[in-house]
Swiss-Prot record:
EC identifiers of the protein: 6.3.2.4
UniProt keyword list: ATP-binding, Cell shape, Cell wall biogenesis/degradation, Cytoplasm, Ligase, Magnesium, Manganese, Metal-binding, Nucleotide-binding, Peptidoglycan synthesis
Gene: ddl
Record pathway: Cell wall biogenesis; peptidoglycan biosynthesis
Source organism: Mycobacterium ulcerans (strain Agy99)
Catalytic activity: 2 D-alanine + ATP = D-alanyl-D-alanine + ADP + phosphate + H(+)
Localization of this protein: Cytoplasm
Name of this protein: D-alanine--D-alanine ligase
SUPFAM superfamilies linked: Glutathione synthetase ATP-binding domain-like, PreATP-grasp domain
């Protein structure tokens, strides 16, 4: 069912959050911020949490329950509401049905889904595929771009094929335990060891000697059997938001900069999970203090990076600004939407307030529809 068939009524937006990934808590926090900022005059919001075990739960949508409180991370549980399912059958028209007891009862019907899921089993094309099967429009990238954007190896392959600047890296698939001599020489030290399909800096280690690599690889593999090792790049950390509008045009936001080195004991400059979400230790400059020509070049690169993976809807593109120019580091197809997250802050600094930003994403999803495009 589309919003246009219910003229004069509010659009029903299902905000889906939580999920099975190790970024479950950050997804909850992002959803809380979105629930506070979706315009209630335009949207009827349905809040659906996914437990760490994968159960879908219809919740009351209370944003306060989705906040980090005294360093305690929020979590969806089966007691958070009524368990439900979205049938992968377009004939159901976006209806959400209860699971036993009362199996099959229609609990709600939605016009569009806002999948605020970070990491595997959500941001990686899986829920996007379900929504395509179910015939329900959704905010953000499609199946291919979501999968490619989640996997750092394939993101970099697509960027390299498009002639975009990326840093040295090597990939360890599950059958490989260590880097070879050529890779070690090419990457040098220090280096960063990361789960290939993760985010929020979870499982990431900075190594300053090759002796530290085995432990760092093991730490990353607790989150993903595939690991990527990246050369450390000496440069300022810049970010840029890309937003698609209902008419298909793309715009890049004002830039933001993350500064961690020397902040509250973080002389290594490593923007890890605790620095991001628990300690509030990073300094964020929005807009970033860069020359206009540099900002323009980074914004153009952000849109090229977005297009190179066939992205849709939105993305945050992360850069290092080196003496030789910008280098693209990562792209997030569903960036954080917490109160400290750079993506909404950069758009606010660009003159797009938070409710308008969210409304644009929903309108773009409805304009795009589903299926091949």
């Amino acid at each position: 069912m589309s919003g246009s068939s219910r003229r004069g009524e509010r659009l029903r937006v299902a905000v889906v959050f939580g999920g099975r990934s190790n970024e479950h808590a950050i997804s909850c926090v992002s959803a809380g911020s979105i629930l506070r900022n979706l315009d209630p005059r335009r949207f009827e919001v349905i809040a659906i949490g996914i437990t760490p075990q994968g159960s879908w739960v219809l919740t009351d949508g209370n944003p306060d329950a989705l906040a980090i409180t005294d360093r305690r991370l929020p979590e969806v549980s089966s007691q958070s509401g009524t368990e439900l399912a979205l049938p992968a059958d377009p004939r159901w028209g976006g209806q959400l049905v209860s699971l036993p007891p009362g199996a099959g009862e229609v609990l709600a019907s939605v016009d569009v889904v806002f999948p605020v899921l970070h990491g595997p089993y959500g941001e990686d094309g899986t829920i996007q595929g379900l929504l395509e099967l179910a015939g329900v429009p959704y905010v953000g990238a499609g199946v291919l771009a979501s999968a490619a954007g989640m996997d750092k190896e394939f993101t970099k392959k697509l960027w390299s094929a498009a002639g975009l600047p990326i840093g040295p890296h090597a990939v360890l698939r599950p059958s490989r335990q260590s880097l070879d001599r050529e890779e070690l020489q090419r990457l040098g030290l220090p280096a960063y060891v990361k789960p290939a399909r993760g985010g929020s800096s979870i499982g990431v280690s900075r190594v300053s000697s090759f002796d530290e690599l085995p432990a760092a690889i093991a730490a990353a593999r607790r989150h993903d059997p595939k690991v990527i090792v990246e050369a450390a790049i000496n440069g300022r950390e810049l970010e840029c938001g890309v937003l698609e509008f209902p008419d298909g045009r793309l715009e890049a936001s004002t830039l933001g900069e993350i500064r961690v080195a020397g902040v509250r004991g973080r002389e290594d400059g490593f923007y890890d999970f605790e620095t991001k979400y628990l300690d509030d230790a990073a300094e964020l400059d929005v807009p970033a203090k860069v020359e206009d020509d540099v900002a323009d070049a980074v914004r153009q690169l952000a849109i090229r990076a977005f297009e190179a993976i066939d992205c849709q809807g939105l993305a945050r593109v992360d850069f290092f600004l080196t003496d030789d120019g910008p280098v693209i580091n990562e792209l997030n197809t569903m960036p954080g939407f917490t109160t400290i997250s750079m993506y909404p802050r950069m758009w606010v600094a660009s003159g797009v307030d938070y409710p308008t930003l969210l409304a644009t994403m929903v309108e773009t999803a409805l304009s795009r529809g589903i299926g091949l495009r």
